[in-house]
Amino acid sequence: MLFRSDLDLEPALTTYYQKHLTDGTFVSWLAVDGERIIGTSGMSFVEKPPYYSNPTGKIGLLSSMYTHPDYRRQGIARKLLDCVVEEARACGCGAVWITASEMGVLLYTAYGFEKNGRFLQYVL
């Protein structure tokens, strides 16, 4: 089983976001149309030992990427990705990683992400 539909993640997610948005280890963006949220993106920061293609060892893990169906194919996801990449660079990350849905793979590869094992990777 890939997921449990009976599991209530809201309390754990609330705790996670309160902690990590406050301490700066998670950042998030919203795309809005008036007062309506039409897109989201988030990124966690992790550190691995430095290596040749990423001498800082810092990686941005992209998550929570979503665009409302009524607003797709209007460049919103690309603008959110621009925010992610800009923030990752500013924080000294050497790469941004994501595990993507089939629909998302097209967006990410068009943006410049490349397959790296189980992840798609954008080298900064």
Model-derived features with residue positions:
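Active-site rim helix/loop that mediates acceptor-substrate recognition in acyltransferases
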Residues: 6-30, 42, 49
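Conserved beta-strand in the GNAT
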Residues: 30, 36-45, 61, 66
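Conserved acetyl-CoA binding element of GNAT-fold acetyltransferases
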Residues: 53-69, 118-121
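Conserved acetyl-CoA pyrophosphate-binding loop and the N-cap/start of the following alpha-helix
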Residues: 71, 75-83
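Conserved GNAT acetyl-CoA-binding A-motif
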Residues: 81, 88-100
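Conserved acetyl-CoA-binding loop of GNAT-fold acetyltransferases
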Residues: 93, 109-119
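Conserved beta-strand-loop-alpha-helix junction that forms the acyl-donor binding cleft
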Residues: 96-106, 121-124
